[in-house]
């Protein structure tokens, strides 16, 4: 079967902090491993498919090329268009409009996951806990009376931890107003104010459609972050390999959780996955509070499929090889 992997070029990210981090590092500290695109391509080839690569940038010629192409399936790794992350849903809609079969989230699911305030309302409607929140537009505040400090302030319509760093957690009105202004000015979108939940950062990988399966849980251990730094999975922690925060954190299977707690977390993740209409594969980020309560933080459609990332880590813990996971995602997309 002919399978085309669609992925992003770097154009449009040159001005974003961390865009060229790898190039800035000494050679001995650069990561020597395959990219997710290369790993997926190798897996597809091992499974007997004919993979090809097509980089997506902001040029209309690229869309024309996709529309005229004739692969049996497209592995959609595209998270932006022309450097604009809010266009992720539009790209999925484009693939639908031109009749291409593709893996992962639909345009609708991408929209629901991207708009964190809507996602929160949906998961709360389905009986799940999520931190109290308010959306702050320029000039007005809604429901802020329900929130108590400390508060984490995020861009309401961004992903990949953009706009989330140590300064995102605030403890006073002055800090709150300054952070809201920062989000409005830097990201040109509403600010999401969210009750800060102290606890463990748990990732639940989900695989499937009609009967989705929760894979073994993975934890991002934030306990060794520098003193005074809030325990959040911010941009420095996840992506900036130059920082102490990055070096002090790591993800690993959450093997110390008891069976009852594991089942509660997986059940919440499965409910959120289906409520937000994710398909094929996804990841739900949760917080296990010190009280034992499970909070849904956000959904990640089309999570990173790097062999060393949390999704593949969860699959491996459950007995699946990387190639098997890629094969299952391909099969599910073809059955839809």
Regions from the PLM with identified roles:
Residues 12-17, 159-162, 242-245, 308:
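Short acidic/His/Gly/Ser-rich catalytic and metal-binding motifs that mark active-site loops
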Residues 173-267, 290-295:
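Phosphate-binding site of ATP-dependent enzymes
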Residues 58, 171-172, 321:
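Alpha-helix N-cap recognition
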Residues 1-6, 66-68, 110-192, 197-200, ...:
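Active-site nucleotide/adenylate-binding loops and adjacent lid/helix of ATP-dependent enzymes
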Residues 122-124, 256-336:
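ATP-dependent carboxylate activation and anion-phosphoryl transfer catalytic cores
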Residues 51, 101-102, 130, 151, ...:
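Hydrophobic beta-strand scaffold residues
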Residues 151, 208, 298-301:
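Short beta-strand elements
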Residues 1-101, 108, 113-114, 137-143, ...:
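ATP-binding N-terminal substructure of ATP-dependent carboxylate-amine bond-forming enzymes
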